[in-house]
Design a protein with these regions (language model features):
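Alpha/beta-hydrolase fold catalytic core
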Residues: 3-6, 19-61, 274-287
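Active-site loop/oxyanion-hole signature of alpha/beta-hydrolase fold enzymes
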Residues: 91-131
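Conserved hydrolase catalytic core segment
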Residues: 126-164
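Short beta-strand/loop motif that positions the catalytic acidic residue
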Residues: 216, 222-224
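Conserved loop-alpha-helix segment in the C-terminal half of the alpha/beta-hydrolase fold
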Residues: 226-253
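Catalytic active-site module of serine/aspartate enzymes centered on a nucleophile-bearing elbow/loop
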Residues: 252-287
């Protein structure tokens, strides 16, 4: 069971830092940060059958930041202090993750997306900027499709549209399916049920078509690493399918762009939010 838990950590967004720091006998900054357990900044919202935990930082235009599979608010230790200088940063532990406990059997990206929309309604926010990492990027895309009035501008990194080897690195895709099968064979327990729900998302979700992406009208920055878990050609397809989009592929980068390329990541997204979207066509393509 311990081995299975370790494997789950490897795929989670926090694991990259944890594994690297473990090799040097260091402690992950995500384990010691106040973010994700800040009593002064955190609250619960009772919505859609769960108590959704969220934290807010800073003042200014609202900015929603969404974590990935098995993650939490503390995954954004490098984004919160940067963006809180000029934005009101809102982060939630997605359903069935972090402090947002969900004892139900089902979990989907659509459920998590509608949770976030309900949270924005509760906070009386008509619209906001959005950053999504990994599964959080999927939620960001769905938020822009299902609740288009809520998203002013969107930046996603490491998102995918479907659970196939054409989108996800074949090694990771096959691992997720095999791990799901292994978990299903274990005796049921609250912890195991939670892990099954999360791994099922990796192995069998989402199901978004390129035609659906064309419904996204807000300016969108699509980000990925050239050695990302999400294949670069799939990231390019996402950008090509969204009418008002930019594409940014980081060289020598994997899936954890907000961590290992945090300075570039933060400044590039900040500039994208602050500047008008520029439609590039015709002779403008020579610029």
């Amino acid at each position: 069971m311990k081995i299975l838990k370790l494997l789950l950590l490897i795929i989670s967004v926090t694991s990259v830092v944890n594994v690297c720091l473990a090799q040097s006998d260091a402690v992950s900054p995500m384990d010691t940060t106040i973010y994700g357990r800040n009593k002064a900044a955190g609250k619960f919202i009772k919505t859609r059958g769960i108590n959704l935990y969220y934290e807010t930082y800073g003042e200014g235009e609202p900015l929603l930041i969404i974590h990935g599979n098995g993650g939490s608010i503390n995954n954004f230790i490098y984004q919160i202090p940067y963006f809180a200088k000029n934005y009101k940063v809102i982060l939630a532990d997605s359903r069935a993750q972090g402090k947002s406990v969900d004892k139900g059997d089902s979990l989907s990206y659509e459920m998590m997306t509608d949770d976030l929309n309900a949270m924005l309604d509760t906070l009386h926010l008509n619209n906001c900027y959005v950053i999504g990492w990994s599964d959080g990027g999927i939620n960001g895309l769905l938020l822009a499709m299902r609740h288009p009035d809520k998203v002013k501008k969107l930046a996603v990194t490491g998102a995918n549209l479907w659970p196939e080897a054409t989108a996800v690195d074949p090694f990771i895709y096959n691992w997720a399916k095999n791990y799901y099968d292994s978990l299903k064979k274990l005796p049921p327990s609250p912890n195991n049920i939670g892990n099954i729900k999360l791994i099922r998302l990796l192995a069998f979700e989402p199901h978004i078509t390129t035609k659906q992406l064309q419904k996204i009208k807000c300016p969108t920055l699509v980000i990925g690493g050239d050695h990302d878990v999400i294949l670069p050609q799939h990231t390019m397809l996402i950008a090509q399918s969204i009418p008002n989009s930019y594409l940014w592929i980081l060289p020598n980068s994997g899936h954890s762009t907000p961590i290992f390329y945090r300075e570039k990541f933060n400044t590039e997204i900040d500039n994208f939010f602050k500047n008008l979207y520029r439609k590039i066509d015709g002779f403008g393509r020579f610029n």
